[in-house]
């Protein structure tokens, strides 16, 4: 009866009422991936790069940056207990403690620079002392303090650029220096001897309490000792190896140090005898950044997944494993997505999600499936470039062509995009194929007027200051699965949408979506809210958009499309995703948070490609959104 009445009214009113009914009847769920916990108060902290474990099993980790919490996170029994400090207070590379205090490498500060250690009262969580350690006070983007250890009333500090380990009282009074080239992680054995990891040399060196050189552990070629822990009950030194073995090596210290065992799969996540190459999980470690044990004999291993540049708040991710005394996995705490996004995977109909570096699946935090970076086979992978101006390639876009995945990885507000393919021999590892700008596309111009890869694998790019869209047709795959593209067609950008800032092309419906930037603005990444939809673009319609969508909400930042819907995220305003009909231009619904008791959805989307969308074969739309506050990915599942 209601439908008949709607049909009876004037056409204009009819459209409005139908839109209203559609808005009211849409349903969606709100979920998250890439963090063990969904709320800001409980979320696992971003980018933990070192850890210290108290005897009672309280775990402290240090991070360079956590957007919405203190940089030292506190955990116990798989739960979040709180944080210490502010979001950027710490460097992240070193932490230790004793019964009363924590000692943490401080981040670069405009007042005192780099190279200091802060002492924090474990009862109050407040800093009560700063110890200036290094004369290298101008290093903003690298670790100056690379190791910390305490023994009795002494504090040992690795001054990396000073090529020394400095010894202080725990009250900050200098005692002596021990000369060591490039010192890193530290540990003290039962006799008070100091063990110093020299990561790049593959050496762990022993010094007496007075600083005299003693034994040396020369590890195998390629080994990289990144973390140390002395296991007193067993008299063993545990060494976290970030070289190709990616495991923990155990040394007995009676007499000449001798390796007596390992913990973790040899080859870590790249091993193919116990899993798929790239697959993470129980004892399939990535970078072993921290090791600790509690009085009950539980072992804690902090992993950092591979990928990231000079921004140490985005290089690696928190992947903390707890193992019982028998070596059985007890729990994991993970924070894997900061200023990043994972796209639903067409090959698995949206079951898997690929970010620039990782693969996820599941619900309610999900499962960390794989790290797609192989630093040993592909050391020049752009996702490992410490000089990358984008601070990492964490944002993923995906295309499926004939069953072949193409991954495009980029930064937060990118001018260049990196391409990867997959094959069965490499498992989950993404194989680098080049970039735009770069050789595969025969251009050195940055992409400043929009980028898209469509379902045919074609690339559409608005190259800097050309006022054209370059359309690179995909020409196929070679025998290894590597894609290639042909010479571009140059298409004049419609004047009504200049300056252009976003491009989406839907190959199945021949629909082009163009979003306008802000004329005269210094911020070429910004959108002004004017979006033109061209149906039949390849068929010749490059001048008559219909519909034209002028957004009413301020500061749109990221758009994605699937089916006949457009999804819009905003910056500095609301966390919502608005959904528009690409046929009518009408606002259909707004996705907010239907799961407030279990999760937060962040503040906004402050990245150009921080929203992805996919239409599943079931008719369900899967929309992902970056939540940098919670170091997670928001996942909407929408049923129109």
How does the language model describe each region?
Residues 341, 359-361, 602-640:
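Blade-level signature of beta-propeller repeat domains, shared across WD40, Kelch, NHL, RCC1
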Residues 39-68:
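Beta-strand-rich domains and repeat architectures in extracellular enzymes and scaffolds
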Residues 58-60, 102-104, 155-157, 193-196, ...:
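Conserved beta-propeller blade signature
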Residues 32-41, 85-88, 129-140, 218-220, ...:
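Surface-exposed loop and turn segments in beta-propeller and other repeat-based domains
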Residues 70-73, 115-118, 164-166, 202-205, ...:
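A short loop-to-beta-strand structural motif that recurs across blades of beta-propeller domains
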């Amino acid at each position: 009866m209601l439908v008949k009445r709607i049909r009876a009214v004037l056409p204009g009113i009819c459209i409005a009422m139908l839109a209203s009914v559609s808005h009211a009847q849409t349903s969606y769920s709100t979920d998250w991936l890439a963090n063990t916990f969904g709320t800001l108060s409980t979320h696992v902290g971003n980018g933990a790069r070192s850890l210290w474990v108290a005897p009672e099993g309280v775990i402290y980790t240090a991070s360079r940056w956590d957007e919405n919490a203190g940089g030292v996170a506190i955990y116990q029994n798989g739960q979040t207990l709180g944080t210490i400090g502010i979001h950027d207070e710490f460097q992240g590379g070193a932490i230790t403690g004793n019964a009363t205090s924590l000692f943490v490498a401080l981040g670069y500060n405009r007042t005192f620079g780099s190279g200091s250690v802060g002492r924090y009262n474990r009862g109050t969580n407040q800093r009560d002392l700063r110890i200036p350690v290094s004369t290298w006070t101008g290093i903003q983007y690298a670790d100056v303090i690379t190791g910390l250890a305490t023994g009795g009333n002494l504090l040992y500090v690795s001054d990396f650029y000073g090529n020394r380990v400095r010894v202080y009282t725990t009250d900050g009074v200098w005692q002596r220096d021990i000369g060591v080239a490039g010192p890193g992680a530290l540990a003290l054995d039962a006799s008070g001897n100091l063990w110093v990891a020299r990561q790049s040399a593959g050496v762990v060196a022993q010094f007496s309490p007075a600083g005299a050189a003693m034994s040396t552990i020369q590890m195998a070629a390629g080994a990289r000792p990144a973390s140390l822990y002395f296991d007193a009950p067993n008299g063993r030194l545990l060494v976290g190896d970030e070289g190709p073995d990616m495991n923990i090596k155990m040394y007995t210290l009676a007499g000449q140090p001798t390796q007596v065992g390992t913990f973790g799969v040899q080859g870590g996540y790249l091993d193919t005898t116990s899993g798929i190459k790239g697959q993470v999980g129980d004892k399939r470690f990535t970078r072993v950044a921290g090791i600790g044990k509690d009085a009950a004999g539980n072992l804690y291993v902090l992993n950092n997944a591979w990928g990231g540049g000079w921004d140490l708040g985005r290089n690696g991710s928190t992947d903390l494993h707890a193992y019982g005394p028998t070596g059985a996995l007890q729990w994991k705490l993970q924070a894997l997505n900061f200023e990043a996004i994972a796209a639903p995977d067409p090959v698995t109909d949206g079951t898997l999600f690929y970010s620039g570096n990782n693969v996820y699946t599941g619900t309610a935090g999900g499962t960390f499936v794989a790290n797609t970076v192989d630093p040993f086979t592909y050391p020049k992978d752009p996702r490992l470039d410490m000089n990358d101006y984008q601070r990492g390639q964490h944002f993923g876009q995906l295309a499926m062509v004939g069953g072949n995945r193409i991954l495009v990885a980029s930064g937060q507000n990118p001018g260049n995009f990196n391409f990867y393919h997959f094959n069965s021999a490499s498992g989950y590892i993404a194989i680098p194929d080049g970039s735009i700008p770069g050789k595969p596309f025969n251009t050195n111009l940055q992409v400043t007027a929009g980028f898209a890869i469509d379902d045919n694998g074609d690339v559409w790019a608005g190259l800097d200051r050309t006022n054209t869209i370059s359309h690179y047709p995909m020409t196929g795959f070679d025998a290894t699965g590597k894609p290639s593209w042909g010479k571009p067609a140059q298409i004049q950008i419609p004047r009504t949408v200049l300056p252009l800032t976003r491009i989406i092309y839907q190959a199945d419906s021949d629909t082009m979506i163009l979003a306008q930037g802000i004329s005269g603005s210094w911020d070429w990444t910004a959108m002004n809210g004017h979006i033109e939809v061209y149906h039949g673009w390849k068929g010749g319609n490059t001048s008559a958009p219909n519909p034209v969508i002028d957004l009413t909400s301020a500061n749109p930042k990221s758009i994605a499309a699937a089916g006949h819907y457009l999804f819009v995220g905003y910056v500095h305003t609301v966390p919502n995703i608005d959904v528009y009909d690409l046929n009518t231009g009408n606002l259909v619904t707004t996705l907010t948070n239907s799961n407030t008791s279990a999760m937060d959805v962040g503040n906004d989307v402050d990245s150009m490609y921080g929203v992805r969308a996919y239409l599943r074969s079931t008719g369900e739309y899967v929309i992902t959104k970056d939540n940098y506050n919670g170091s997670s990915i928001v996942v909407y599942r929408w049923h129109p």
